[in-house]
Amino acid sequence: MGGVFVVFEGGDGAGKTTQARLLDQWLTTEGIPHLMTREPGDSWLGQRIRELVLSPGSGPISSRAEALLYNADKAQHVDEVVIPALREGKVVVCDRYVDSTIAYQGAGRALDPGEVGQLACWATTGLVPDVTVLLDVDPCEGAGKIAAKDRLEAAGDEFHLRVRQHFLDLAAAHPQRYLVLNARKSRKEISEAIRQRVTGLLNR
């Protein structure tokens, strides 16, 4: 297909969005064609789904319904945004992807992560990132410091502990794809490690 698919994952407050933006800035400076995107919300359908699943004002959403909504966003996002950019040979920088759905809607909501993963694989036509950057942080230091919380950020300590552990389990199961970084390190240290990994993918 061409292109390079870079995904940022991690618990709330880990700094993944900050690092995704820093990578976006570096790619711009280097003149490398790229696209920065996010899930949920970077398609016309995803914008509406994002409002439903994250707004604290939304009514109760069952765990299975939530998983289906997130995967509907993924299906549209991959078809409309990600695959076209990769076919153009761009670096796609994505803030959250399949593993967030498995960790949050699977482990976090106490659904079967395997079933959620199968659904996500189908929704994304099996598209796997070239690298998944996991910024690991204790939930008490991440989600705990966010003042204005959305529905998932406000889900409670046990929820976020399950999410963190499942991210680490996924990283252990896919060591070649994952780059696990301690989110407590400096922004500079983290961004340099990410740039080094992405440079290697660009030069392969």
Swiss-Prot record:
GO terms for cellular component: cytosol. Gene3D superfamilies: P-loop containing nucleotide triphosphate hydrolases. The gene is tmk. Phosphorylation of dTMP to form dTDP in both de novo and salvage pathways of dTTP synthesis. Belongs to the thymidylate kinase family. The keyword Endoplasmic reticulum does not apply. Keywords: ATP-binding, Kinase, Nucleotide biosynthesis, Nucleotide-binding, Transferase. GO terms for molecular function: ATP binding; dTMP kinase activity. ATP binds at residues 10-17. HAMAP family: Thymidylate_kinase. GO terms for biological process: dTDP biosynthetic process; dTTP biosynthetic process; dUDP biosynthetic process. It catalyses: dTMP + ATP = dTDP + ADP. It comes from the Bacteria. InterPro entries: P-loop_NTPase, Thymidylate_kin-like_dom, Thymidylate_kin_CS, Thymidylate_kinase. This is Thymidylate kinase. Its EC number is 2.7.4.9. PANTHER family: THYMIDYLATE KINASE, UMP-CMP KINASE 2, MITOCHONDRIAL.
